[in-house]
Amino acid sequence: IFFADDYDPNGVNERASEALILAVMQLKNEPWMKDCRLWMYRGQWGQWEIDNIEMTVPMSPEEFGVKRQAILKHQSQVHDAPFRDPENGQLAWQTSIDRNTALADLYSRLGLASYEAMEAFVRYHIED
């Protein structure tokens, strides 16, 4: 299960994440849950520190284009919504795209394979 972490200062991702975690906690003793993994990503509101990243998903130029188009299908991402980056004034989708390319550039500079973009994830561990 992939979900946004709760770093969103507008509270939308936080509420969705809380609902997901509550549901998972209610289901944690189901047999299929032993094979279930929860992975958190960050959208517009920041990036994981490199030493905290547990998984990355590299994207080719074509895959990155598909992601960009998928983001733009959401009305909240294309209009002049109040969800702008407080530092540079970009819309959420622009910041997310920039974050994905910046991570790929960082991995390349570290001597790892080069990709168009990368999404980073940190695993959420279900409490007992």
Regions inferred by a protein language model and the residue ranges of each:
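Metal-dependent de-N-acetylase/amidase catalytic core
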Residues: I1-D128
